[in-house]
Structures are given as C-alpha cells and as structure tokens.
From Swiss-Prot:
Presence of keyword Coiled coil: no
Omega-N-methylarginine PTM sites in chain numbering: 101, 110, 590, 615, 628
Residues recorded with modification N6-acetyllysine: 56, 117
Swiss-Prot/TrEMBL catalytic activity: ATP + H2O = ADP + phosphate + H(+)
Ranges annotated as biased composition (Basic and acidic residues): 45-69, 94-129
Annotated Pfam families: DEAD, Helicase_C
Expression sites (tissue/organ): Found in heart, brain, liver, skeletal muscle, kidney and testis. Low expression detected in lung. In testis, expressed in all types of spermatogenic cells including spermatogonia, spermatocytes, spermatids and somatic Sertoli cells within the seminiferous tubules. Also expressed in Leydig cells and other interstitial cells.
Residues bearing PTM Phosphoserine: 86, 90, 130, 182, 455, 592, 603
Lineage: Eukaryota, Metazoa, Chordata, Craniata, Vertebrata
Name of the protein in its database record: ATP-dependent RNA helicase DDX3Y
GO MF terms held by the record: ATP binding; ATP hydrolysis activity; RNA binding; RNA helicase activity
Residue interval(s) of motif Q motif: 179-207
Gene assigned in the entry: Ddx3y
Source organism of the structure: Mus musculus
Length: 658
C-alpha cells in the first residue's frame, strides 16, 4: 500500500511540474519547444506567436500597444494612445484607475464609441473617453436616428406676417437682433440640425433671444404662444456647450464615481410646469443635440423613478425637469447642480400658478447651484404678471426684458369667434362644429373639469366620433398614449382640461373649441394658443353664456387687440360690466395696467432698488408703441361689423373664412 501511495504522489508531483509554465519555460531556455506530455490550457495555446493581435482573455480585450490610436469602433483615447483594457494582473476591474490615466478602467465600464453610444460590460461604471476631444466637431451621422428625430417636422405657412410684429428690448447694451440663423456663429452641429429641422427663418423671439443668450446676458422674454420659444433658448445654449465643452462637470462626475456613486452634474437645467411640456422640450433638445456629445435627459412626476435614474446614470449634460421630481432626485443624491451654467424657467407663470415657487426657490437659492451673475438665467413665458417679474428680480442679474408681439395678447394667425350658447345647447352646437370640420383636421376641445372631460368623451364616442381625452387623473402612460393618438390623427378630437393647455406643441391643430370658458383670461390666451402655432393659421371658437360674465371685459380687450370681429352683444355686456364694476375700484386685470405687460423696471421708477430704470437703452423694431399695456389703441375702428351677432347657423357664413 505504501509503495502504491508513493508512486501516486510522485505521479501527481510530476503533473504539477508539467503545469508550471515558468519552470517549463526555464527548462527549455525560454523557447517555444514544449515538453512531451505538457498540458497547456486552451486560452494560453499559441500565446507567444500571437503578439500584436487582440486576444480575449479572462479579463477582457487585451490589444497590443502598437495598434493605431483609433479602435475598430471609432473611439479614441484622449491622448492618442490605443483604447485597450489592462490584464487581470494590473487592471482595477472597474474601479477608478489613477495610474497614468484620468479615466475609468475599461473592464466593466461603458465605453463611449465615436457616435456616443455605450457598451455595457460586467459593472456599470461610465467611461467617457472623449472627454478631451473637441465637442464642437460633429459625430458620424445615423440614418435611423435622423429619420426618428426629423421625419415629423413641418414649417408654418404665414411667416411673412412675422415681419410686422413689434418687438421691444429693454436693458443696458442690448445686442443687435439677427435676420437669419447664419448671421450669428452657432457652430457646425447646430447649423446642420437647423437644416434637418427645416427651419428657414428665425421667428421674432428667436431673432432677438439668440444673440442675447449668445452674449451670456440674462433674459426675461415674453412672447406669443407658439412663437418658437423652445428653440430660442435651446439653440444658443447647446451652441455654447459645444464650444466650451463639459468643463468641470465631467471631472466632478468622475471624482464622484470613484466612491461608487453615480451622481450627475448637468451643465444646463430647464424647468417646466407639466410632464407633457417637459417631454416636448426634451424631444426638441434631442433634435438639436444630434451628432453631438451632449446627452439630454428628462425627469418628471408620474413616471417610473427607477427607470429615470437608470437613464440619468448613462450621463446627463442637459436636464429637463418638473420642479417636484427634480427636488426628489436631488435629495436622492442623483443630481448635483454645482456646475450648472444655464438655467431656464419655461412657462414660469404657470409654475407659480401650480404652487411650485417653494420648489423653485429650493432648487435655485437653497442648494449648490451657482449664484446669479455666475450662472446664466433665462425666463420664458407667454405672460408675465407682477409675481413673475418679482421672481426675476431675485433670479436674474442685469437682465434684458424682451417683449415680442403684444405681451399677453393672442396671435393674429388665430381667428377667434365667440358665440352665445346656453349650457344645455353646448353638445348639439359642438356636433355642428365637428361636422363642419374636415376629417383630417385636428380639433382640441377644452372643458373645465375632469368629470366633464370623461362625460364629453363618452358622448362623442356614442355619436361615433374618433376621440380621446386627457386630464390630471389619467396615468402618465394613458396621457402619452392619448397625445400620440391625437398627433398621429388616429383620433383627431382631443377633449382636455387645463393640463394640456400650456406649452404643448401640436403643430397642426386646426380648431380649438372652448366648450367651457376658463375663469381667467390668461388661461384663455394659452388655450387658444394651441392653434395657429409657428406661422400656421388656426381657428378658436368659444361658447359664452351667463356663467362667463367675469371675463367679459378682458375678452373684449383681447378681441380688439387681435383685430377680431366682436359680437355686438359682447360689446354691450362689457360696457354694462365695466360700469357696474367701476364703483368697486379699478379693475385688477393684468390687461388693465402696464405692470405685467412691460418691463417692471420702467414702470416702477426708482422706488425698486436693484432694477435698472434706464429707458434710453430700450430698443424697438417692427412696430408701434404700446400705449394700452399690451399694445393697440382705442376701440375706434375695430367695430365696423356690428351685424356679427353670433348667428353661425346661417348658410351665408363660411365658418372657415373661405
């Protein structure tokens, strides 16, 4: 037994010696001659004869160092060295490698290729190997992505009228406006994407806002609904990011990643009041960041938080967010605003109406965001009442006030009709309007309550109309599906509450119907602004009865301002309402005074410290002075058609103006 055991032990020792690569190499003088019976694992066979070839070992791809600086995927090391992974013996397996390269080790990382895509491996670290590259150079095109982003765009048909829209810019040293996109340097990427988007001419707000933002001036812009405000701030912001690169934000992200955290530091932040508007801005940002290294993200309430966090962890340079969800992400440690250079508040008055002021101040003033004067801040909206201009005093530094068109007014591209309809007759009147509308035309019907939206949708469905509805009680998925069906024309009638009234860009809406008029005139402005967008012509019809007497005067002012036909009964009611209310003091409507309609610094005089009241630097183009708060003049000359009367059942009236 002892002899057998000894022989067995000797046999095992001999086999181990045969497996010892180093002793075997030494015995053979380091040559390639193999001992008889020596076992070589498959992954090590012919290793010595494969120098200069990338072999996949157990730790990843290991490439020879004499390979060209560009990998087969088009990615490039930031110092011209090849993009290869270290061996198991010296690699850090996904941890931060601080030895000679300021980047994550490739093992288990997500390597960013030349087109900005990510490759996942075992761990989820983010490796941006193009951090020192020139961000102003476009990446290779993608036919699939280009088709996805730019296939649905369309341009307006009434841009000639934009030349007559009055524009007023107030503030020190206002940069001159542009007439064409080519008049200002925005870089190769932006100009290419403008061409893909089929934008031929800038709108008035774009003509003035783009050079102001490019000069890094703070801006408060008040422009008509549907005038192109989104592109007015995205184009210059992205252009500047492409020129400046990521700066300290990328370095901070990497330093944070050393300790296993995945906090993102966006360079630009856009705040929006609603989920729908946030998604819309995000989609526009995707278009203008095409072929760039900038990665936009969007976060909003009512959607899966985990999925939004995963999307953020892939990288975020431009963030579009609703205030509530952004505060949540900041408290979770997923978002840091330490290096935010650009802050945009879109539909700022709507955010205040929805009670977001505490969250906005928490984001801007009580966290790590750079202070005003260091960051670049812009506020955009269709209306700017007193509360918003007071917010501007706190957030903006030496800003320029830009009033494009008649502030708080409606577009002349929209034909407005007001008809007297009793409450019980509304549904039958609505059916008459829908029957007069072409089958391919999109119609948006606004109601005041969620219950009313569901009820009207059921009624139209029973009448065999293809319709859908959205309101605040619907899930985010249901709302997105409803908007998709409406945009695509599968269900050309959308019944909505005010949740869809602000900021939604559904470009080919032909007809907006106020089944229920809102209680304030500003909501009316935003509702009818869903049609007649960016140069297109549209129609807005409002059902008026005794329940709407509170907005009679403001509605009359608005119709006069937009040079619309005014029913004689509405003029009479406004006259009576005016004298009934005169004994109670001056109207508090935003349209009765100049505060919300012009630069607060000019109307308040020297009583407000911190505001520049120098009127000599005001610049004006294409229009006359504003002498009624938002433009226009007296009532004279606009009431030539007193026979309007609101009787639209007559065959002599062509509803569409043909």
């Amino acid at each position: 037994m002892s002899q057998v055991a000894a022989e067995s032990t000797a046999g095992l020792d001999q086999q181990f010696v045969g497996l010892d690569l180093k002793s075997s190499d030494n015995q053979n003088g380091g040559g390639n001659t193999e001992s008889k019976g020596r076992y070589i694992p498959p992954h090590l066979r012919n290793r010595e004869t494969s120098k200069g070839v990338c072999d996949k070992d157990s730790s990843g791809w290991s490439c020879s160092k004499d390979k060209d600086a560009y990998s087969s995927f088009g990615s490039r090391d930031s110092r011209g060295k090849p993009n290869y992974f270290s061996d198991r013996g010296s690699g850090s397996r996904g941890r931060f490698d601080d030895h000679g390269r300021n980047d994550y080790d490739g093992i288990g990382g997500r390597d960013r290729t030349g087109f900005g895509k990510f490759e996942r491996s075992g761990h989820s670290r983010w490796s941006d190997r193009s951090d020192e590259d020139d961000w102003s150079k476009p990446l290779p095109p993608s036919e699939r992505l280009e088709q996805e982003l730019f296939s649905g765009g369309n341009t307006g048909i009434n841009f000639e009228k934009y030349d007559d829209i009055p524009v007023e810019a107030t503030g020190n040293n206002c940069p001159p406006h542009i007439e064409n996109f080519s008049d200002i340097e925005m870089g190769e990427i932006i100009m290419g994407n403008i061409e893909l988007t089929r934008y031929t001419r800038p709108t008035p707000v774009q003509k003035h806002a783009i050079p102001i933002i490019k000069e890094k001036r703070d801006l408060m812009a008040c422009a008509q609904t549907g005038s192109g405000k989104t592109a007015a701030f995205l184009l210059p912001i992205l252009s500047q990011i492409y020129t400046d690169g990521p700066g300290e934000a990328l370095k901070a992200m990497k330093e944070n990643g050393r300790y296993g955290r995945r906090k993102q530091y966006p360079i630009s932040l856009v705040l929006a009041p609603t989920r729908e508007l946030a998604v819309q801005i995000y989609e526009e940002a995707r278009k203008f960041s095409y072929r760039s290294r900038v990665r936009p993200c969007v976060v909003y309430g009512g959607a899966d938080t985990v999925q939004q966090i995963r999307d953020l962890e892939r990288g975020c340079h431009l963030l579009v967010a609703t205030p509530g969800r952004l505060v949540d992400m900041m408290e979770r440690g997923k978002i840091g605003l330490d290096f935010c250079k650009y802050l945009v508040l879109d539909e700022a008055d709507r955010m205040l109406d929805m009670g977001f002021e505490p969250q906005i101040r928490r984001i801007v003033e009580q966290d790590t965001m750079p202070p005003k004067g260091v960051r670049h801040t812009m506020m955009f909206s269709a209306t700017f009442p007193k509360e918003i201009q007071m917010l501007a005093r706190d957030f903006l530094d030496e800003y320029i006030f830009l009033a494009v068109g008649r502030v708080g007014s409606t577009s002349e591209n929209i034909t407005q009709k007001v008809v007297w309809v009793e409450e019980l007759d509304k549904r039958s009147f609505l059916l008459d309007l829908l029957n007069a509308t072409g089958k391919d035309s999109l119609t948006l019907v606004f109601v005041e309550t969620k219950k009313g939206a569901d009820s009207l949708e059921n009624f139209l469905f029973q009448e065999r109309y293809a319709c859908t509805s959205i309101h605040g009680d619907r899930s985010q998925k249901d709302r997105e599906e409803a908007l998709h069906q409406f945009r695509s024309g599968r269900k050309p009638i959308l019944v909505a509450t005010a949740v869809a009234a602000r900021g939604l860009d559904i470009s080919n809406v032909k007809h907006v119907i106020n089944f229920d008029l809102p209680s304030d005139i500003e909501e009316y402005v935003h509702r009818i602004g869903r049609t007649g967008r960016v140069g297109n012509l549209g129609l807005a019809t409002s059902f008026f009865n005794e329940r709407n007497l509170n907005i009679t005067k403001d509605l009359l002012d608005l119709l006069v301002e937009a040079k619309q036909e005014v029913p004689s009964w509405l003029e009479s009611m406004a006259y009576e309402h005016h004298y009934k209310g005169s004994s109670r003091g001056r109207s508090k409507s935003r349209f009765s005074g100049g505060f919300g309609a012009r630069d607060y610094r000019q109307s308040s005089g020297s009583a407000n410290a911190g505001f520049n009241s120098n009127r000599a630097n005001s610049s004006r183009s294409s229009g006359s002075s504003h002498n009624r708060g938002f433009g226009g003049g007296g009532y004279g000359g606009f009431y030539n058609n007193d026979g309007y009367g609101g009787n639209y059942n007559s065959q002599a009236v062509d509803w569409w103006g043909n």
